[in-house]
From Swiss-Prot:
It comes from the Bacteria. One of its GO terms (molecular function) is UDP-N-acetylmuramate-L-alanine ligase activity. The keyword Ligase applies. Coiled coil: none annotated. Pathway: Cell wall biogenesis; peptidoglycan biosynthesis. It is found in: Cytoplasm. The gene is murC. Cell wall formation. This is UDP-N-acetylmuramate--L-alanine ligase. One of its GO terms (biological process) is cell division. Keywords: ATP-binding, Cell cycle, Cell division, Cell shape, Cell wall biogenesis/degradation, Cytoplasm, Ligase, Nucleotide-binding, Peptidoglycan synthesis. It comes from Phocaeicola vulgatus (strain ATCC 8482 / DSM 1447 / JCM 5826 / CCUG 4940 / NBRC 14291 / NCTC 11154) (Bacteroides vulgatus).
Amino acid sequence: MDVNTLKSVYFIGAGGIGMSALVRYFLSKGKKVGGYDRTPSELTEKLIEEGAAIHYEESTELITDAFRDPATTLVVYTPAVPDTHKEFTYFRENGFEIHKRSQVLGMLTHAGKGLCVAGTHGKTTTSTMTAHLLHQSHVGCNAFLGGISKNYGTNLLLSDSSEYMVIEADEFDRSFHWLSPYISVITATDPDHLDIYGTKEAYLESFRKYTSLIQPGGALIVRKGIELQPALQNGVKLYTYSQEEGDFHAENIRIGNGEIFFDYVSPLGNIPNIQLGVPVSINIENGVAAMALAQMSGLTDEEIKRGMASFRGVDRRFDFKIKNDKVVFLSDYAHHPSEIKQSILSMRALYRDKKLTAVFQPHLYTRTRDFYKDFADSLSLLDEVILVDIYPAREQPIPGVTSKLIYDHLRPGIEKSMCKKEEILDVLSKKDIEVLITLGAGDIDNYVPQICGLLNKK
């Protein structure tokens, strides 16, 4: 089906961060857009305000006539939707063209030059930073992001003239195999989603296959030292990057007074005195990767410097909520042991003499089962850990798999406790908080406004 001739697009799972970018894209193209999501959220309410017809009850009766013609309606679904879903079954049994979100994204990106950021972690910030660099420059871009840009308040950026499309390339369910990147960054290959892949070897092979999809004439920029054996087509250049090593890296890093500056080193030309708009050490490496993509896309040095300094970050990615002399509070989406470790180390670099407390909500029973010792090792870098129950997302409980697996493997001597998420405000009210971070990809973020209110009263 030619997406340009569509009249209507129906989304099953419309409120997901990746799906919502496509909802906004088709609304911008004048299509009739509707769909289902399991629960209302701030994001679904915004989509409704923007023109989407979204409902929250699983019922074929709520599918309006605008979405009942198979000849003019495309159905898009997220892999988290079960085959037994009533609306999914209706569309499947009535001859509709049905595609995963990643397939539709692939259709849209084949025509342009895809700047794709893949990796177990770091891809949302790096892709959003890249999109900001291009969007504020003479080059411009379209961008489908996996988080809400704080510069623009959206996860979709559009351009009528740019051939570049910035994409967060998601490895879940092998979704990134539908893409056709022109240039790709791979930030990390730490095993994850073993409920899908089964083994570390299968996970790494999926990344290897992804590298084979990069178009001839393009490039792969890999974080130096990660476990990866690329399978590049002829004519694809290979580069490395990291914070302090690789073809692209940073030198003369200066951290102090709440600011970070560094000199950017590149085979395409060095740029001195880069200032990070979100001054946390983890963003030095993210910034190096984003600047490499920007340089390869034709941005000037001045455009890159201006864009790096004006980048405001991504919602729930090292997202400072309170930052004053009494208390610091931030929310972070980190949900894999490696990214949790990086987040904590970044906080340590900023607040060396402060007590660091985290509330962690594990995400998925399978991930907790597979990595509970690694989670405990990362969280043991904190002074205090408060664990809440596992957020199940798409999964059913697994006997014996609870947050206590992590709790029992934390280092001796660390302050630790467990509670229901509904009890978190009461628990925090009894503590002397200096620096607090909420960690996790579940619904712990729903408590952030109340936590802010509590801490501001102290």
